[in-house]
């Protein structure tokens, strides 16, 4: 099986190299948010740290990284060009994300693979379609995700012992906040993983309430190990108060809303991308039992009530941001226009949202050796707190939840409707099919706006 992974990994790396080259040849102008990111990084490369573009919503982590990365490239290529000149080549800066995705991320997640029965293939984590697109653009998402996964891995494996691993994890977690502010929620989740791991080491599993009490006691007992994460939360609270909000700039377009339906969007994306992991006849039977047959049919009443609640949320807590309606360079524009904004969509989406919500929670709770009930609650709670306040329907916000979900959910052993195929291999081919499709659309489907004549537009997540 290892040889299969080597072959498939080689195929994916070669594919990424080809795509990067094609993007470099065809996307010669900064694309969407790259306009701000590239310009700000180039400003930092000129050592003008006093200049800041107030349209940028995230901290300067990407620009500091880009500046350092460009300096490293300059030195290892022995170029006589200045740092400013190197940074003016936007493909050099773009390659920082490709390096992160193909080198750094695999090294981190490989340490989380269980040797006897691997719960995932490293190449599949790297090939996730929501990540894949941004390996070739200068966006914050890749390194924001890498640093959170690195922080998580240190807490889970503790290669340097409890205290040292926790403090390094906390430092890396702090660095992740310089790329995306909402990572503060995932820092709290990582802290819950640490405490729960310690709880299981020192206490037998008992009832949920007693486990919760033991969790709190363990957090107090291990306060020294938890301190780096508490410090991050305190520092972030100070930042929010001083900054008068979470976003750095463009605050008018990023006001907080109660966008509860975003949870259903997230769970639907997560279920769609991970179907090779969970889809089985046994799961379908379990869902039917949960919705209709369970408790002598009483579950039917609960299901009807859930459906009514979902419709209420759709009708009252769907936020339609002006960007969603105006920007046809994102898949969400077409998802909204052709699916979610159709007549009766608030009816036919109910069973989809119901199933996807149940599926995510069910697959987490049925994974032996995965998350415990306590950390499932902190994970789901993290998703809620991260995405519900956001007015934007933005799949990039689902990257970290999807990564964590996939790191912990083990593929079912059941055949795919009677067909004998490795679930990991099926997942790889599914991801590759999606990656190829979004690459073809991105490179081949070109259009222009009347407001920007001659400037080629493309479609991404």
UniProtKB/Swiss-Prot annotation:
Its EC number is 2.4.1.256. GO terms for molecular function: dolichyl pyrophosphate Glc2Man9GlcNAc2 alpha-1,2-glucosyltransferase activity. Pathway: Protein modification; protein glycosylation. Glycans are attached at residue 316. Its main location: endoplasmic reticulum. It is a multi-pass membrane protein. It catalyses: an alpha-D-Glc-(1->3)-alpha-D-Glc-(1->3)-alpha-D-Man-(1->2)-alpha-D-Man-(1->2)-alpha-D-Man-(1->3)-[alpha-D-Man-(1->2)-alpha-D-Man-(1->3)-[alpha-D-Man-(1->2)-alpha-D-Man-(1->6)]-alpha-D-Man-(1->6)]-beta-D-Man-(1->4)-beta-D-GlcNAc-(1->4)-alpha-D-GlcNAc-diphospho-di-trans,poly-cis-dolichol + a di-trans,poly-cis-dolichyl beta-D-glucosyl phosphate = a alpha-D-Glc-(1->2)-alpha-D-Glc-(1->3)-alpha-D-Glc-(1->3)-alpha-D-Man-(1->2)-alpha-D-Man-(1->2)-alpha-D-Man-(1->3)-[alpha-D-Man-(1->2)-alpha-D-Man-(1->3)-[alpha-D-Man-(1->2)-alpha-D-Man-(1->6)]-alpha-D-Man-(1->6)]-beta-D-Man-(1->4)-beta-D-GlcNAc-(1->4)-alpha-D-GlcNAc-diphospho-di-trans,poly-cis-dolichol + a di-trans,poly-cis-dolichyl phosphate + H(+). The chain crosses the membrane at residues 6-26, 92-112, 119-137, 138-156, 159-179, 220-240, 260-280, 290-310, 344-364, 368-388, 425-445. GO terms for biological process: dolichol-linked oligosaccharide biosynthetic process. One of its GO terms (cellular component) is endoplasmic reticulum membrane. It is found in: Endoplasmic reticulum membrane. Keywords: Endoplasmic reticulum, Glycoprotein, Glycosyltransferase, Membrane, Transferase, Transmembrane, Transmembrane helix. Belongs to the ALG10 glucosyltransferase family. PANTHER family: ALPHA-1,2-GLUCOSYLTRANSFERASE ALG10, DOL-P-GLC:GLC(2)MAN(9)GLCNAC(2)-PP-DOL ALPHA-1,2-GLUCOSYLTRANSFERASE-RELATED. Dol-P-Glc:Glc(2)Man(9)GlcNAc(2)-PP-Dol alpha-1,2-glucosyltransferase that operates in the biosynthetic pathway of dolichol-linked oligosaccharides, the glycan precursors employed in protein asparagine (N)-glycosylation. The assembly of dolichol-linked oligosaccharides begins on the cytosolic side of the endoplasmic reticulum membrane and finishes in its lumen. The sequential addition of sugars to dolichol pyrophosphate produces dolichol-linked oligosaccharides containing fourteen sugars, including two GlcNAcs, nine mannoses and three glucoses. This is Dol-P-Glc:Glc(2)Man(9)GlcNAc(2)-PP-Dol alpha-1,2-glucosyltransferase. The gene is ALG10.
